[in-house]
């Protein structure tokens, strides 16, 4: 008889280093170097002839779904998108290679941020085996060369803890604000309009949008409106008007995402109604 052990070792993480989080020099260094890792142009206009913005959105959504299903660290997806955009900003790429490029970028980001990284074989399965592990490994070297091995890019997640530490928030609310901000950061990564925004602005706008959204349901902050935006802008040395515009765009992206989700749910419900005669009604009401 074979025994199956279902216990899984917890992911090992270092505890937050107070010396880093409470030293403003760390935040200033991040602000100084963040733009080094941004794509240098809107590559759809001057580099890519075969790839369109909607294709980038489709592969980014697929990458997000893979990262969510594999329970990757929050930093993996935005970092992988950073690699994708930087590569596409410099290398004309046929659309038939876009999913391969996305898989390679997740492969690299996972190696950098995960304790147990994604494997080449697993990523190939997510492409319905349209690419082979050897092909992915070969492209890994291509991408590394084009990025000049500069993989430790600054992402919006690098700023989250520095921002939250400086806000007059009760500790019990910070985890919820953090979770919502991380969701907004992921949504921004799927939309190309945010590709050339500084990571600090996306992080600050995401935190602001998270607090404003939560304030509609409960009191999470003593700051509201312009006072909150002014404080966030001071923390990351961001122009107030630019920050307001960024936060508004983040809220629009969230609204569009929710509307799309509801449409998908309505479409799924309509399909379910077609086979209602063969399925007990109460089964449909169960929320899994």
From Swiss-Prot:
Primary location recorded for the protein, binned into one broad class: nucleus
GO cellular component: chromatin; cyclin D2-CDK4 complex; cyclin-dependent protein kinase holoenzyme complex; cytoplasm; cytosol; microtubule organizing center; nuclear membrane; nucleolus
Function noted in UniProt: Regulatory component of the cyclin D2-CDK4 (DC) complex that phosphorylates and inhibits members of the retinoblastoma (RB) protein family including RB1 and regulates the cell-cycle during G(1)/S transition. Phosphorylation of RB1 allows dissociation of the transcription factor E2F from the RB/E2F complex and the subsequent transcription of E2F target genes which are responsible for the progression through the G(1) phase. Hypophosphorylates RB1 in early G(1) phase. Cyclin D-CDK4 complexes are major integrators of various mitogenenic and antimitogenic signals.
Annotated compartments: Nucleus; Cytoplasm; Nucleus membrane
Entry-linked PANTHER family: CYCLINS
UniProt domain Cyclin N-terminal: residue ranges: 26-151
Entry GO MF terms: cyclin-dependent protein serine/threonine kinase activator activity; cyclin-dependent protein serine/threonine kinase regulator activity; protein kinase binding
Phosphoserine carried by residues: 270
Post-translational modification comment from the UniProt entry: Phosphorylation at Thr-279 by MAP kinases is required for ubiquitination and degradation by the DCX(AMBRA1) complex. Ubiquitinated by the DCX(AMBRA1) complex during the transition from G1 to S cell phase, leading to its degradation: ubiquitination is dependent on Thr-279 phosphorylation. The DCX(AMBRA1) complex represents the major regulator of CCND2 stability during the G1/S transition. Polyubiquitinated by the SCF(FBXL2) complex, leading to proteasomal degradation.
Modified residues (Phosphothreonine): 279
Protein's recorded name: G1/S-specific cyclin-D2
A single GO BP: G1/S transition of mitotic cell cycle
Subunit-structure text: Interacts with either CDK4 or CDK6 protein kinase to form a serine/threonine kinase holoenzyme complex. The cyclin subunit imparts substrate specificity to the complex.
UniProt region (Disordered), positions on chain: 264-288
């Amino acid at each position: 008889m074979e025994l199956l052990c279902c216990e899984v070792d917890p992911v090992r993480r270092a505890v937050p280093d107070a010396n880093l989080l409470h030293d403003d020099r760390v935040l200033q260094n991040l602000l100084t170097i963040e733009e080094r890792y941004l794509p240098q142009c809107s590559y759809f206009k001057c580099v890519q002839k075969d790839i369109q913005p909607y294709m980038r959105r489709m592969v980014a959504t697929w990458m997000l779904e893979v990262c969510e299903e594999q329970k990757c660290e929050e930093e993996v997806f935005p970092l992988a998108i950073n690699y994708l955009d930087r590569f596409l900003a410099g290398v004309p790429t046929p659309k038939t290679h876009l999913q391969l490029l996305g898989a390679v970028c997740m492969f690299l980001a996972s190696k950098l941020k995960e304790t147990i990284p994604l494997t080449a074989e697993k990523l190939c399965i997510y492409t319905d085996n349209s690419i082979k592990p050897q092909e992915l490994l070969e492209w890994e070297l291509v991408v590394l060369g084009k990025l000049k091995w500069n993989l430790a890019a600054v992402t919006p997640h690098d700023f989250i803890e520095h921002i939250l530490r400086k806000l007059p928030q009760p500790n019990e609310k910070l985890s919820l604000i953090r979770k919502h901000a991380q969701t907004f950061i992921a949504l921004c990564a799927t939309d190309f309009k945010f590709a050339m925004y500084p990571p600090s602005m996306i992080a600050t706008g995401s935190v602001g949008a998270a607090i404003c959204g939560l304030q509609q349901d409960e009191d999470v902050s003593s700051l509201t409106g312009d006072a909150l935006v002014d404080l966030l802008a001071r923390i990351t040395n961001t122009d107030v008007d630019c920050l307001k515009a960024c936060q508004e765009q983040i809220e629009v992206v969230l609204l569009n995402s929710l509307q799309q989700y509801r449409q998908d749910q309505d479409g799924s419900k309509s399909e379910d109604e077609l086979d209602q005669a063969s399925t007990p009604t109460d089964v449909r009401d169960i929320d899994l």
